[in-house]
Structures are given as C-alpha cells and as structure tokens.
C-alpha cells in the first residue's frame, strides 16, 4: 500500500508528530528519511528492503553509498541522506559514551571503543584527547585505510591535541582481521608519536589495537619501555 493511501493516523510522519519518534518502528523511521518511494513500491517497502541488508539496524552504518545504490528506489540523494543519518546517530552515541569517562587502565579504552571499532572493514586511526585528570574530552578520527607510519603524521595528531589544549593523548586503531598483534608499522608509528609527544609536552599514554572483542595495549606489551 502506498503511504498516501493510508489513513492519516497510520502515516509514519503524522504518527511521529502525534505520538513522538519513540512510537515508530525502525521501518517507519527509515521511511521518513527516504521520504518517497518508487513506482509500485512505497518508502516503507524500500525501508523493509534496506533492513534486510544487515542482521541488525546498528549494522546499517556499514553500508557504503554504493551498497545503498544497489537497492531499488534508493538514488544518490537518498543514499547521502541515509549515510548522514547513520553517521549522526553514531556520533550522538559516541558523545554520550565518552561523557566524563576517566581512563585508569587500557581496558577502559577498550570498553569505550570496542563496539564502535571491532566490526569496521577498514583500519581507522583515532586520537583520544585527555585532560589533566585523564578524562576523555574528545575523540578525533584522523585516518581511514591501511595504517602506515608515513601516513600517520605526528603533525596531524598533535595539532588536534594542541588546538584542544589537551594534557595527553591515547591513540587507537583497529585491525579488521581481528588479530591484535602489533605490526611493524604499528610499532614504528607508536615510537614516532611518543617521541614527538615528549618534545611537545603532550604525553602519548598508550596505543590500543582493537580486534574481534579483544585488544592489545602497546604499553602493557612493553613497547613504551624501549
């Protein structure tokens, strides 16, 4: 059934206005984002098809623009809207997660980052900015791709820390393979960042590697003692 054929009280947009967003199903919320359907298919039909692409709604964020464009009824404009909505939801979730979290152990970092990073299909490099009490004040995602010591430049990392008047930083990246063994590039990157941090007076407290529900701390592994 087309949405314009529904009774007024059954239409997703009108239901949201009357009863609030929490009263809507995932399909209805996606249908509102999609706005319109295509010939023979309503936005609700397309939303149902979209949900079939992943096992959970949280995993929708894994869909690229090209993945979304493969779904009939989703063009570039709709794909961009969806990606923006997924990213905004992720950022809101991350902001609430990081609110006044104090880092006292590498496992604290893993707890913060595991759900966000363990299923990423590419390597991402994140800088956590901390104040003098080791409370995370901000996270900065600075790189996506294959980690290489020549790509992760200390200037980019520490510019953020200086701009935010951070006392110290912790860097985090993921291994899509799930194996958290540090590579030579991981170790080289760590040494470069630690050396620059010592010069600037902004301590690199740790480098955490996130894998499949496990992690490695390069501090605990002894690399900061060398």
UniProtKB/Swiss-Prot annotation:
The keyword Protease applies. Transmembrane segments: none annotated. Residues 102-224 form the MPN domain. GO terms for molecular function: metal ion binding; metallopeptidase activity. InterPro entries: MPN, RadC_JAB, RuvA_2-like, UPF0758, UPF0758_CS, UPF0758_N. This is UPF0758 protein SE_1336. PANTHER family: DNA REPAIR PROTEIN RADC, UPF0758 PROTEIN YEES-RELATED.
